[in-house]
A protein has these predicted regions:
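Rossmann-like S-adenosyl-L-methionine
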Residues: 1-175
């Protein structure tokens, strides 16, 4: 992991968090998956064993280099990683008529933005697995997504830092 890359610092709870995200997605091996705000690619790499293909997008170039290296070192061939703004990436994918079956999104504390979410909705994933570290921006983004036809099916908090107010939340939305 490069010094400028983000990674969860609590490995025990991180494993629980990511396994819950994979469980919520209920992948069968046939899905096309996008891992947005993918960091070093951990969620996408885990999902790759349960999906047909995974595309990861991340703004931080060091994290993308780490994701590519992680895929290579683990001999994972059904994953591609791209460096760029997630909203712009999704907008371009939607404009080209691309679709996906499952979207994993793990945005920074500021949450996602309307450009990203509108493009995601246009691409029409059956399931969105949203991982959030900020309940306020999660509520804001869920409001947007539910107005666009998605329903919240499951919510699971994961305590990453005991005895603090910080919590990660995994949410499953579907149409």
């Amino acid at each position: 992991i490069s010094p400028k890359s983000f990674y969860q610092v609590n490995p025990v709870q991180t494993e629980i968090l990511y396994q819950k995200a994979i469980e919520f997605a209920h992948l069968t091996g046939k899905e096309s998956v996008i891992d947005a705000y993918c960091g070093i690619g951990t969620i996408g790499l885990i999902a790759s064993g349960h999906a047909k293909e995974v595309v990861g997008v991340e703004l931080n170039k060091d994290a993308v280099k780490d994701a590519i290296l992680n895929a290579k070192e683990n001999q994972i061939r059904n994953v591609r990683f791209f460096q760029g703004d997630a909203g712009e990436f999704m907008e371009a994918m939607a404009a080209e008529g691309n679709s996906m079956d499952v979207l994993f999104m793990d945005p920074p504390r500021a949450g996602s933005d309307e450009k990203f979410m509108a493009s995601a909705v246009k691409m029409g994933p059956e399931k969105i697995v949203y991982i959030s570290c900020n309940p306020e921006t999660l509520a804001r983004d869920l409001k947007f997504l539910t107005k666009k036809g998605y329903q919240v099916k499951k919510i699971q908090p994961v305590e990453m830092f005991a005895f603090t107010e910080h919590v990660e939340t995994v949410v499953l939305l579907s149409r």
